[in-house]
Regions:
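Hydrophobic alpha-helical segments
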Residues: 1-168
Length: 168
């Protein structure tokens, strides 16, 4: 059974600490998040997490996922240029399809998911991968909303400690 995160692990200036208020739901949410994140290549997942977090203005998730991307071998150049991925020559067609789909689903309030984004997705991803990627986009958007909504800012090292407890 997962023990509760310590104060050091949740160094946040939060309006509300969901880990303290709803620990079993947060454990389940983290388990889902980890399962989805492991279902596609790590480099792609980190780009998706960063791009959605840029759109949503989530400092917590940007801090965490840019660090994780670097640790997994992502280059500074690709991280810096991610918000301008359409103009930058450093992304594969598969990454471009994933980033386009990420933007379409993250910006639903600006209109429906664009047919062009889905066509690009279909060209690069199997149907199963399309579902996995869509779930990943939903997960990171959920984390963004928790972090922004409740004012969470968790140190990336502390987040790893919490993830390890969930995995145990």
């Amino acid at each position: 059974m997962m023990s509760e995160p310590t104060e050091k692990e949740t160094t946040m200036t939060a309006k509300l600490d969901p880990f303290a208020v709803a620990p079993s739901l947060m454990k389940s949410w983290m388990g889902t998040s980890m399962a989805v994140a492991s279902s596609l290549e790590a480099s792609l997942i980190e780009l998706v997490k960063i791009r959605a977090s840029q759109i949503n203005g989530c400092a917590n998730c940007l801090n965490m996922h840019t660090k994780e991307a670097r640790e997994k071998g992502e280059t500074e150049q690709r991280i810096y240029l991610l918000s301008a991925w359409r103009e930058a020559p450093y992304y594969t067609d598969r990454e471009r399809a994933a980033l386009g789909w990420t933007e379409a689903l993250t910006r639903l309030s600006e209109g429906h998911a664009h047919a062009g984004a889905y066509e690009a997705l279909k060209a690069e991803f199997t149907e199963e991968e399309q579902v996995k990627l869509t779930l990943m986009i939903n997960v990171i958007n959920g984390w963004n909303r928790l972090a922004v909504g409740f004012g969470l800012f968790v140190d990336p090292e502390a987040a790893k400690s919490i993830q390890a407890k969930v995995a145990a």
